[in-house]
Amino acid sequence: MTMFKEAVTFKDVAVVFTEEELGLLDVSQRKLYRDVMLENFRNLLSVGHQLSHRDTFHFQREEKFWIMETATQREGNSGGKIQTELESVPETGPHEEWSCQQIWEQTASELTRPQDSISSSQFSTQGDVPSQVDAGLSIIHIGETPSEHGKCKKFFSDVSILDLHQQLHSGKISHTCNEYRKRFCYSSALCLHQKVHMGEKRYKCDVCSKAFSQNSQLQTHQRIHTGEKPFKCEQCGKSFSRRSGMYVHCKLHTGEKPHICEECGKAFIHNSQLREHQRIHTGEKPFKCYICGKSFHSRSNLNRHSMVHMQEKSFRCDTCSNSFGQRSALNSHCMDHTKEKLYKCEECGRSFTCRQDLCKHQMDHTGDKPYNCNVCGKGFRWSSCLSRHQRVHNGETTFKCDGCGKRFYMNSQGHSHQRAYREEELYKCQKCGKGYISKFNLDLHQRVHTGERPYNCKECGKSFRWASGILRHKRLHTGEKPFKCEECGKRFTENSKLRFHQRIHTGEKPYKCEECGKGFRWASTHLTHQRLHSREKLFQCEDCGKSSEHSSCLQDQQSDHSGEKTSKCEDCGKRYERRLNLDMILSLFLNDI
């Protein structure tokens, strides 16, 4: 047996694993690794190894995860020493550093028997090592040349470890889960995965009793209770409780988006974001609500939806004690308390915290629509609305109702349709109890109770509750009639009036009387007809006291008393005393068409 003549240093007997390889060790293997490292260190101290600054180790209290990193060689190749550090991922407890001398003081009392000490002659070129290494851990033997990987130039102490590492580059996946068919490079990673779907959760949090399948998951979870954030961004100083969170955050500074969707070319910072985005193209909705059966692309959307059923408002404002179902809604609300509203609308006096919100609000008063469709010329306030509108021309639909199969150009329309399909009214007015399928419709309805009329006409000063009302009203001043009937060429100020008019040409009568089966073109005439069956007379003349079923009959009576011709034809401008006379003229005209 060839004996060594030169001094033995700690690097000569150090166990070296990469961070990736150490991440695959289970609890028992990590403990074994720690014991081997300490045993080697004790052996060096026992043979009189001289301490130096380069031999300093960094230990942390309650360490569970050890990483050995070999730093760059700081001295020349001729006899230079290599600095090594034993690091750990911090879990709980404050940081604490022990020097070699302190470790020696802690372990010297254990080295009482002569056989506990070893001499440098006990280390041979064949790599005689303590028995703890038999579990598969490799020692860098004195005089051995480490194995180098050709692609990343990474060095490994053992050829078997190099072979495992090469699987990361080659994509070779040899270990498959029989239940989920998920594949792994390492058998240890497969074992960890199998614990997850087997339901084995041995590690329990002492604070909240939450259980985990891996000890590392428990230690990461405990940072929520301790508030520890050991991973800090060097750019902005922001701290994170997870290393992965810091990596994702750092890409915000670099602008790196390495994960690209092959369907639409959109790029993402994280691979999980790409996978979630791809579900839009595939239509996959793996997260299903067990209450109503509705499915979602992401778990976060399911969690937000679940709050609707539970009526849970877990996010409370500390200033006014108002509660919200989502954190984003709470953050937006808190800005109303903390930020000064410097930007005031001159039209209605409403104030805003930022200029952008003021500019958006002013479009309600001006009716400005800078984004025009190249196909039909329709204008929109926002580019996003124009993009959604263009789907109508392209025939692109993004949402399909599971109940009736109807397709929609916008997800919001589809969700509103499904709520109406299920008669689901999620938003209720606290004043009158009326329910709505969307919060936007509820906000519009509440103006009826508050009397708010934020939209004022500059021509006549008339106020309106909704932007659509003032837009229709402005056409009375301008005389604009943008909606034209293709059958007869007649134009209208509103699209709804055009649709009603087209029923004259199509003969459509969607409103039918349940008593006699008679059909009507409009809901108003249907209601008027129903009063004939109920004998209800709601309209009474103040001059003679006579009651009528129709408001038109009341108007005719009042015209008889006053002699005024109140019924005017929109086509020729001629006036009639009775609405009935005008209707007869119009019917004759339509029969001639």
UniProtKB/Swiss-Prot annotation:
It is found in: Nucleus. Signal peptide: none annotated. Keywords: DNA-binding, Metal-binding, Nucleus, Repeat, Transcription, Transcription regulation, Zinc, Zinc-finger. Its main location: nucleus. A zinc finger (C2H2-type) spans 145-169, 175-197, 203-225, 231-253, 259-281, 287-309, 315-337, 343-365, 371-393, 399-421, 427-449, 455-477, 483-505, 511-533, 539-561. The keyword Isomerase does not apply. GO terms for biological process: regulation of DNA-templated transcription. GO terms for cellular component: nucleus. Expressed in lung, liver, pancreas and thymus. Lower expression in heart, placenta, spleen, prostate, ovary, small intestine and colon. No expression seen in brain, skeletal muscle, kidney, testis and peripheral blood leukocyte. One of its GO terms (molecular function) is zinc ion binding. PROSITE patterns: KRAB (PS50805), ZINC_FINGER_C2H2_1 (PS00028), ZINC_FINGER_C2H2_2 (PS50157). Residues 8-78 form the KRAB domain. SMART domains: KRAB (SM00349), ZnF_C2H2 (SM00355). May be involved in transcriptional regulation. Belongs to the krueppel C2H2-type zinc-finger protein family. This is Zinc finger protein 284. The gene is ZNF284.
